[in-house]
Amino acid sequence: MDIVARIDHALQAALAAHAAPDGPPRLTAALRHAVFPGGARIRPRLCVAVAMACGDDQPVLTDAAASAIELLHCASLVHDDLPCFDDAPVRRGQPSVHAAYGERLAVLTGDALIVLAFQLLGEAAGAAPMRAAGLIGTLARGVGVPHGIVAGQAWECEPQVALRDYHRAKTGALFSAATCAGAEAAGAPSAPWLALGDCLGEAYQVADDIRDVVSNPDALGK
């Protein structure tokens, strides 16, 4: 199984395992809408690739970490598309979650994806609890404060911001978390992989900014 298929299989299993016939059906549908079809799955691919480079001796934990990273990324997109931020009508070639399901359900969808991400790590912790504990901290730093995705989004609410600080928080932090998480899932030191994630995240953001300027929005699917 190639890496993308492995990630999508893990994501499908995670959503299916946490859906219930007596749960809110529109929320269940919105969660799937937010995650599928996926984009390039760059961040979870980095996580799995680093884990494989480090031996990948706990694939269940690797899959949980990669899935959690993608769910956190999807949550950030759902929230970023909201009318109070970008008010984006399209995401990944289909209506954004708030365009398809309404603003209130979009907020709840993003929240639910964040909770599910950390729930997956907790459920996979049995085989290697110390590694899982480290992963929870790594991913929390990648999405939280003071330098994660939430901080990156918060910089948009400030009158002035250093562009590099903004890029590092909004984009780079989760790339760094992905490479470090891959190493941690495999029981390897994460420090050697931190710079790789930092550099890839910054390069990705610059490329994405250029693409936004020179490309047709319809071609971008966002």
Regions found by a protein language model. Name each.
Residues 1-19:
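N-terminal amphipathic/basic leader segments beginning at the initiator methionine
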Residues 23-222:
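Mg2+-dependent prenyl diphosphate-binding active-site environment of isoprenoid biosynthetic enzymes
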